[in-house]
Structures are given as structure tokens and as C-alpha cells.
């Protein structure tokens, strides 16, 4: 399970250094193999260990290519999916087209989200956090049953 937000830097080649606290888990569970794709709802990237991504691929394969909405989701997620292998120094090369999509330059937030990471431009991440907090403070809609049962 991945949790927490960590500031990491992209080097001049577009590689990010995976924090050491995640490296052993990624090597053990995915032999360092990751898949990066776009987030279709936010200006960030999604970074999955390969076994987790294969579950997503199975779900995507069950969508209908005849349904325009389902086909669009398949096209966006699979069409942007890029495999990346963690090197011996614990770095991952993020494809240029993906970096461009998320506006990633130097400072990047690596955000743990259970079975995957989100990769955000640092400034965009903090703007999103502020928007999310503001939205929660002004909530007028009814919470879903699952959120009502969540006790923090």
C-alpha cells in the first residue's frame, strides 16, 4: 500500500528517484516494473506497479469498443500507458509525452494512493489540495453511504 505525498525531483533526462521506503516493495511485488498513464480527470499521471496495472487492463478489456464513452476511456488510458523499469539506482524514466501532459518539469509530488501513485507538478498539487479542502468545507450535497460510514 502506498500512502503519503513526497516531493521528488526529475533529472534532466526526465527520471525520478523513487523514495527508498517504496523501492523494496516495488522490487518484491513488481520486480521494479511500472506502468505510467494519464489521469483522465486531473492534470496528473498515474503510476502503477505492473501487477496492479494488469488488473486495470483486464477491466478495460471488458469495456465495449462499440460504446463511445467506454472506447474513449480505453483509448486515453491504454493509448498513453507507458512501461517504465526502475533502474539499479531506483529511478524511473517518465516518457516525455506524459511529462508534458501533466506539466511536469523539475519538482514533482509523488502521492501514494493505495495501489498506485499520482504524479503532480508541485504547484498544481498544492492548488488541487486547496481546491479539495475548500470544496469539502462548503459541501452542500449529501455524502454517499460509504463516506457516511467513514469514521476518522
Swiss-Prot record:
Pfam families: MraZ (PF02381). This is Transcriptional regulator MraZ. It is found in: Cytoplasm, Nucleoid. It comes from Citrobacter koseri (strain ATCC BAA-895 / CDC 4225-83 / SGSC4696). Residues 5-52, 81-124 form the SpoVT-AbrB domain. GO terms for cellular component: cytoplasm; nucleoid. Belongs to the MraZ family. InterPro entries: MraZ, MraZ_C, MraZ_dom, MraZ_N, MraZ_sf, SpoVT-AbrB_dom, SpoVT-AbrB_sf. Keywords: Cytoplasm, DNA-binding, Repeat, Repressor, Transcription, Transcription regulation. GO terms for biological process: negative regulation of DNA-templated transcription initiation. Forms oligomers. Negatively regulates its own expression and that of the subsequent genes in the proximal part of the division and cell wall (dcw) gene cluster. Acts by binding directly to DNA. May also regulate the expression of genes outside the dcw cluster. One of its GO terms (molecular function) is transcription cis-regulatory region binding.
